Amino acid sequence: MPTGHRDHLKRKTAPKSWMLDKQGGTFALMPASGPHKKTECIPLGYLISRFLRYASNFKELSIILAEKNIKVNGRVRTNSHFPVGLFDVVSIEKTGEHFRVLYNVHKKFHLHRISSEEASYRLTKVTKKYENQGIPYIVSSCGLSIRFCDPAIDLGYTIKISNETSKVIEYIVPGPDKVIFVSRGKARGRVGVINTISTQGKETVYGMTDFAGNTFSCTSKSCILIGESSENIWITLPKERGIRQSELEKINAQLGEMIDTEVAEVSE
């Protein structure tokens, strides 16, 4: 049976992070080839129509994009299939709005409103480092190749990239007390401060504590650094600040603290 690139995507097999309803049709937008993996991105058309609700049908969406009103990381994008991933900045020229693409604590995509100053940069992780004809290169998780970079930058570092010049502004070195954002796995969308760093086989495991005091862990491949410390975070976070509540905590937040349900010992 012939195999190759698929041009169509069924709605049932689309990533759950897109939050598509099952009865909205048979097919979904297929992300185009671009800077992000197809399992870790969302088409630009869904951000405009389903998240921002600026378009109610494909015709309106096409008009908005054709008028070059939408920018992603400072560049005009007119393709509704363009893949937008974690920490990318979506800007709307006519309204002056800027949004950063994040995951919420339920592992779904979320558009977080940011200021124009914060919209001037994005964060990405260094995944490759090599040298070609004496020129040092680094490759980021968003597919960007940068040459003549600081030789101190190594694999696993987080770099802040200017959306205007595509040059490295700053970088973060992994270590204790650094703030990370989990981008993969069961803890996707959670934010925590690194407490311990251990090695299990070939994997580096971070033990972390979130801003509510809950502890969890993830591998270094599943997260990205977003701050030097809890007081120095490079991006603004949604109101839940990456804290995932348990079912009991959700009920307590809605109905108030529950009474003590411990069973008292019955004396005969």
UniProtKB/Swiss-Prot annotation:
A matching Pfam family: RS4NT
Main location: cytoplasm
InterPro entries (UniProt xref): Rib_uL2_dom2 (IPR014722), Ribosomal_eS4 (IPR000876), Ribosomal_eS4_central_region (IPR013845), Ribosomal_eS4_central_sf (IPR038237), Ribosomal_eS4_N (IPR013843), S4_RNA-bd_sf (IPR036986)
TM spans (from-to): none
Record has Transcription regulation as a keyword: no
UniProtKB keywords: Cytoplasm, Ribonucleoprotein, Ribosomal protein, RNA-binding, rRNA-binding
An example Gene Ontology biological process: translation
Domain of life: Eukaryota
GO molecular function annotations of the record: rRNA binding; structural constituent of ribosome
A Gene Ontology cellular-component term: cytosolic small ribosomal subunit
Residue intervals of the S4 RNA-binding domain: 42-105
Subcellular location: Cytoplasm
Record note on quaternary structure: Component of the small ribosomal subunit.
Entries under PANTHER family matching the protein: 30S/40S RIBOSOMAL PROTEIN S4 (PTHR11581), SMALL RIBOSOMAL SUBUNIT PROTEIN ES4 (PTHR11581:SF0)
Sequence similarity: Belongs to the eukaryotic ribosomal protein eS4 family.
Descriptive protein name: Small ribosomal subunit protein eS4
Natural source organism: Encephalitozoon cuniculi (strain GB-M1)
